[in-house]
Amino acid sequence: MPDTATVQIPAAGTYQLDPQASSISFATRHMFGLAGVHGTFRLISGQITITDPVTSSTASAVIDAASFQSGGGARDKDVKSANFLHAGEHPQITFTSTQLVRDGDRWLLRGQITVRGNSAPADLVITEARTDEDGLFIKATTRIDRYAHQLTKKKGMAGRYLDMEITARATRS
């Protein structure tokens, strides 16, 4: 992650996230930290509202819990099962911002992530934000503690933390 983010404050307005042009990826460890796991989730929908002042801006996103993919068929099935995400009963993972703050040289989008009905705070570090003729482009990173969401099965075998990278494209509505 760069030491300084490239952040261009977009024009005030409401922007709809484009699921087809956005991506959510993660990296974690398993097998007692010996091996890495990389994968993705699929964005269903989301909205960003830029205000003046920008610190009052808001964002929300809905992620498809059943879209978890890591390239390991048995692992993917297990993560989607009642052992972890229980995607059949809790099909959505949601993020709702609570505030946008300047933290030194970077911007943090503070909010709540809800997984399997359990909410926990999360800070999304905005590493890039820019506008172009197609709308708004944002990159952000965050670290999710699965234990904070009561996803505590298979300690040691499945990593506790997921390092997430969100790349989002949004169009002004």
Regions inferred by a protein language model and the residue ranges of each:
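Low-complexity, acidic/polar, glycine-enriched regions of mature
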Residues: 1-173
